[in-house]
Amino acid sequence: ITQRLVGSVLLGAMVVVAGCGSGRLVLPFQIDPASLVAPRDARTLTSHGAAVRGLSAILVKDLGLPMPPSFTVYVYSGREVFERGLVHDAQVTPVRAAELSEFAVGIGKRRQLLLNDDAGQAHGREWLRLIAHELAHVSQIEMAGGEGRAEQWLAEGMSEYVAFTALERLGLDTVANRRALATAGIRNHAALVAARLDLETLGNPRGFTVRHLREGSLPTYQLAFLMADYLITRDGFDRVVGYFRSFDRRHDRHANFRDTFGQSLDQFEQEVLGHLKTVVR
């Protein structure tokens, strides 16, 4: 992908470099936690740069999540250029990039955030939710020391929790409202009907993708959010953060879950299944 530099603007610790003509915008960020100020007015987050910086501040200041000292945001103008960007900027295999571009509008990777900003997409609440969700993935990967190590359902569910919390801080939504919507949304989910969540499959990236393509993207993400929300309510947000940090020391998803939360994945699956069956009645 060719890139033409058209400008450079210093925003605090952030340098914005725009590339146009290729449908690709590149925004390098440098994060100094001491200089971050968490915004409270969503009306100030009108550009890609302002949104990423403001939401990063909420993650760091309000939620205590670490962000890498530097990372790059890639913004693409449509599905085809997004697919090419996944291959050339994020080193995703062409087959996987083609699959992801069919449904994903954002991807968080190791010190990278890739966004499909289709021309018809409004930059409102859901746009901010998307960015916050993917920034949470960037933070998780930084803590774990690599991609795809932690339980995928927990990575997705925690990212939704973080995104909804960010929207709440901005006065755009509440976690309680999203919890209620998710509870209603999973009432007829296949996993609940079958009384089998199958966290072993939901725990790896490929399995999670297969499940949400088969069972529906929205209810699968709602299920992941409710499971993560249950774990956060039970054990605390800091414990979940510690779980992701544990992968920097040991790459054993089952042992890390057991040592962090005091039970096996199978035991948690039965516990959270019982909880979900109760709340959806």
Predicted segments with their positions:
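Compositionally biased, intrinsically disordered low-complexity regions enriched in proline and serine
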Residues: 4, 75-77, 83, 255, ...
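Bacterial signal peptide processing site
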Residues: 21-23
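Bacterial N-terminal signal peptides that target proteins for export
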Residues: 1-9
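Acidic/His/Gly-enriched intrinsically disordered linker/tail segments
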Residues: 105, 146-281
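Hydrophobic alpha-helical membrane segments, chiefly transmembrane helices and signal peptide h-regions
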Residues: 12-15
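Generic hydrophobic alpha-helical membrane-segment signal
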Residues: 7, 121-125, 217, 224
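Juxtacatalytic substrate-recognition/specificity segment
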Residues: 25-151, 253
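C-terminal motif of bacterial Sec signal peptides marking the signal peptidase cleavage site
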Residues: 17-19
